[in-house]
Amino acid sequence: MHFIAISINHRTADVALREQVAFRDDALRIAHEDLYETKSILENVILSTCNRTEVYAVVDQIHTGCYYIQRFLARAFGFEVDDIKAMSEVKVGDEAVEHLLRVTSGLDSIVLGETQILGQIRDAFFLAQSTGTTGTIFNHLFKQAITFAKRAHNETDIADNAVSVSYAAVELAKKVFGKLKSKQAIIIGAGEMSELSLLNLLGSGITDITVVNRTIENAMKLAAKHQVKYDELSSLPNLLESADIVISSTSAQTYIITNEMIERIAENRKQDSLVLIDIAVPRDIEPGISAITNIFNYDVDDLKGLVDANLRERQLAAATISEQIPAEIHAHNEWISMLGVVPVIRALREKAMAIQAETMDSIDRKLPGLSERERKIISKHTKSIINQMLKDPIKQAKELSSDKKSNEKLELFQNIFDIEAECPHEQAKQQKESKVKEISARRIFSFE
């Protein structure tokens, strides 16, 4: 069995292509089932976000498995197989495990160290698990990856520092006010940066937010989308009298907020602090306003300095997390190697306990007068003898897990003890056959 990961992401395809290869949420369960029913696939998890579409799979053959996954993606989105090959990257074995660990911990994200991907990986795994397309390997590996990512984030605080301008804007406001939940905010503009700033304000706990824009329809649309207030740009002077935070991002060629405007409203603000954050180029807020008492004015250069410093902190944290990945891969490989040993040990124990049971039956027939106490003592001691006899063989079997010729030696081990253990590959194939029947039955039932 082999583990492969096929990824279409921000490095391999531009956003125009990524938009065309994203699964709708309501189509993912069927997609999991369709892929699982494909030849060569033994387990699979599909991850589909705005920045990546990835298929993780356990396959019986690498080349065949890759082809059928690429064909599955091509058919799902109306591409040729060669198109999918050109826009994706393929990871196999240890590289695939490393890829999953890096993705889950945010090291492979556009925004280094972001935590949203962890939840998305978890949701993808849970969906696959509930659909029935995961088995022994992925049930272990994905839990390991999720646990690793949680620990990495907790130990390094990689996600604590803002590395986007819109997020940094909110962080600056926090430096002035501390908690923002009770504050009033104004968003000037209705474009992409304004929406990102609005989302970050909502994420900080602020609910009293007003969107203002030169075109009132655009302000109305953005406000309705996020259930906040809106107003005309001409109302800005009045709104400023009670606002605590203003984030401005327009394409205006003249200042939206001037020194004169702030001086006029400052008299009515009773020395309350006002944070003005200008993320527009050219600037929306006239320079020099910060000279007025309790007015804090930041422009895009101030934000860039904060973002750059925070990015350096994240890069250091990312390096620390990366150093931990080889140990995780090693732990996974050790666990995988034990998969072939466990059935052998189980078969050996079962045979030994069967012999012990036969021996006790023979003793019962030959010594029918034994009391229950005497019988328990004999049973206990025969089991103890068996455990002592099995101790060294079991130890040797476990050591074979790391041997390069483990399969051959485990087969010899089974021949010596005259036992037969089912290999993990056969178990996986049987498990798949059973689950495919369940999926087919489920579909027939749904159709009826």
Curated annotation (Swiss-Prot):
Enzyme Commission number: 1.2.1.70
Binding site for substrate: T49, C50, N51, R52, S109, E114, T115, Q116, Q120
PROSITE patterns attached to this UniProt entry: GLUTR
Keyword Mitochondrion: no
Superkingdom in the source lineage: Bacteria
SUPFAM superfamilies: Glutamyl tRNA-reductase catalytic, N-terminal domain (SSF69742), Glutamyl tRNA-reductase dimerization domain (SSF69075), NAD(P)-binding Rossmann-fold domains (SSF51735)
Single Gene Ontology MF annotation: NADP binding
Record site feature (Important for activity), residues: H99
HAMAP family: Glu_tRNA_reductase (MF_00087)
Miscellaneous notes: During catalysis, the active site Cys acts as a nucleophile attacking the alpha-carbonyl group of tRNA-bound glutamate with the formation of a thioester intermediate between enzyme and glutamate, and the concomitant release of tRNA(Glu). The thioester intermediate is finally reduced by direct hydride transfer from NADPH, to form the product GSA.
Complexes and interactors: Homodimer.
NCBIfam families reported for this sequence: hemA
Protein name: Glutamyl-tRNA reductase
Organism: Staphylococcus aureus (strain bovine RF122 / ET3-1)
Record gene name: hemA
